[in-house]
Amino acid sequence: MEVDFSNSSKEEIRFFYQTISHNVKKYRLEKGLSQEKIALDIGIKSIAFYSNCENNRYDKHFNLEHLYKISKSLDIDLSLLLKR
């Protein structure tokens, strides 16, 4: 029997990542920037990887360093990317 010691369900974590992905895309589109522009700004050479993170595909997601750099590239407060 597997014991789960986590204080968050898998669904909560999935929703958390979806929220971040949604916010990144929303603010990027508001600024009129391409995925390629942001990916290159934050040092990601694979546009496909960036796209997978932004669209929450294949269990790919941004890490904290990515989010920090994205917030700088978009000239927004980092907390906006985390809000529900």
Residue spans of the language-model regions?
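Residues within the helices of the helix-turn-helix
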Residues: 25, 36, 68
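Short C-terminal boundary/hinge segments that cap the last helix of small helical domains
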Residues: 74-84
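The alpha-helix within a helix-turn-helix
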Residues: 28, 39, 71
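A short, Lys/Arg-rich alpha-helix, primarily the initiator
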Residues: 2-30
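Short, basic-rich loop-to-helix N-cap that marks the start of a DNA-contacting helix
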Residues: 32, 57-72
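Recognition helix of helix-turn-helix/homeodomain-like DNA-binding domains
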Residues: 44-60
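Conserved hydrophobic/aromatic packing and binding residues within compact polymer-binding modules
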Residues: 24, 38-39, 49-53, 81
